[in-house]
UniProtKB/Swiss-Prot annotation:
InterPro entries assigned to the protein according to its UniProt record, in alphabetical order: CusB-like_dom_1, CusB_D23, MFP_Efflux, RND_pump_MFP
Assigned protein family: Belongs to the membrane fusion protein (MFP) (TC 8.A.1) family.
Name of the protein described by the UniProt record: Multidrug resistance protein MdtE
Principal place of residence: membrane
Signal peptide: 1-20
GO CC field: plasma membrane
Organism for this UniProt entry: Escherichia coli O157:H7
MF-aspect GO terms: transmembrane transporter activity
Keywords: Antibiotic resistance, Cell inner membrane, Cell membrane, Lipoprotein, Membrane, Palmitate, Signal, Transport
């Protein structure tokens, strides 16, 4: 009995030692399994922003030309200042035009007098014709003279109206509200009616247009994606953001007005026109800008953080994922474009895949890893085409 007890005690001790070793081995194995941060992919939608070059264009342009000839006797504006519709810009010497008006009024008075006398003569001839005291020819002559006299009155009235208009044209006014440019004439200059050179240009800059160019390929691709339902367009006016030449974002949001149905044969592009508020005059005509046109939202898109995408020696994009058994796998993917700090992946991955985004230096394909949730699961989505 004692002998059995002596043999049992060492056996129990050895068993306990083996159990302790197994537990310690399991702990060491768990401790050696690297932890990696993963993002579980789920389909979503992204805003599609087309980045297009363009230039600013005045909303309205008025090239001021004289409609009557004469000598400029006064300039009534300061170059570069705002002028309102109807404001006087130049004064042409009105004296010759006033004389023409006076002459036209005199001609009208003479025509009215002649017409009055012709009417009296015609009425007399008409009365005498009934009693056969005058011939039919004398009556017809009197009627013709009356018609001619009345026609001369009409011509004289038109001459007075034209002379009055010409006198008004001596005061050269702005047809629009805008900013005046550099004057091409000074006081004392002789100008002619409807001359080729403008006196000054007035431009309305608030609001202001931005003319954008888009390649025909991109234009057609966008139409196809909208028609197929891949892109859901914005309802109502299409919003447009603007980046200035210095890299800063313009503070005002514009809207897309229309797209030109004609393709430029030399550039193979179409023109889009956007309109922007310009209350502070920050946008000037001819400025080069870059516009971000909100085309809509692309549906069922997979976004992968940039930390989870690498490129191999052949330049192809790859990603490491954890499969259902927590084994690291290498996937070759198609990463079409970057959106902020994420890639749009069009092939190689699917919804539900766990993409490794941190701890990459501690793993390689084929080994096991322990997943921890990453803080990058949710991110804003804006896609630039």
């Amino acid at each position: 009995m004692n002998r059995r007890r002596k043999l049992l005690i060492p056996l129990l001790f050895c068993g306990a030692m083996l159990t302790a070793c197994d537990d310690k081995s399991a702990e060491n194995t768990a401790a050696m399994t690297p932890e990696v941060g993963v993002v579980t992919l789920s389909p979503g939608s992204v805003n599609v922003l087309s980045e297009l070059p363009g230039r600013t264009v005045p909303y309205e342009v008025a090239e001021i030309r004289p409609q009557v000839g004469g000598i400029i006797i006064k300039r009534n504006f300061i170059e570069g200042d705002k002028v309102n519709q109807g404001d006087s810009l130049y004064q042409i010497d009105p004296a010759p035009l006033q004389a023409e008006l006076n002459s036209a009024k005199g001609s009208l008075a003479k025509a009215l007098s002649t017409a009055s006398n012709a009417r009296i003569t015609f009425n007399r001839q008409a009365s005498l014709l009934k009693t056969n005291y005058v011939s039919r020819q004398d009556y017809d002559t009197a009627r013709t003279q009356l018609n001619e006299a009345e026609a001369n009155v009409t011509v004289a009235k038109a001459a007075v109206e034209q002379a009055t208009i010409n006198l008004q044209y001596a005061n050269v006014t702005s047809p629009i509200t805008g900013v005046s440019g550099k004057s091409s004439v000074t006081v004392g200059a002789l100008v002619t009616a409807n001359q080729a050179d403008s006196l000054v240009t007035v431009q309305r800059l608030d609001p202001i247009y931005v003319d954008l160019t888009q390649s025909v390929q991109d234009f057609l691709r966008m139409k196809e994606e909208v028609a197929s339902g891949q892109i859901k367009q914005v309802q109502g006016s299409t919003p447009v953001q603007l980046n200035l030449e210095n890299g800063k974002r313009y503070s005002q949001t514009g809207t897309l007005k229309f797209s030109d149905p004609t393709v430029d044969e030399t550039t193979g592009s179409v023109t889009l026109r956007a309109i922007f508020p310009n209350p502070n005059g920050d946008l000037l005509p001819g400025m080069y800008v870059t516009a971000l046109v909100d085309e809509g939202s692309r549906q069922n898109v997979l976004l992968v953080p940039q930390e989870g995408v690498t490129h191999n020696a052949q330049g192809k994009a790859t990603a490491l994922i954890l499969d259902k058994d927590d084994v690291v796998k290498l996937r070759e993917i198609e990463a079409s474009k970057a959106i902020g700090d994420q890639w749009v992946v069009t092939s190689g991955l699917q919804a539900g895949d766990r993409v490794i985004v941190s701890g990459l230096q501690r793993i390689r394909p084929g080994i096991k890893a322990r997943a921890i949730s990453s803080s990058q699961e949710n991110a804003s989505t804006e896609s630039k085409q």
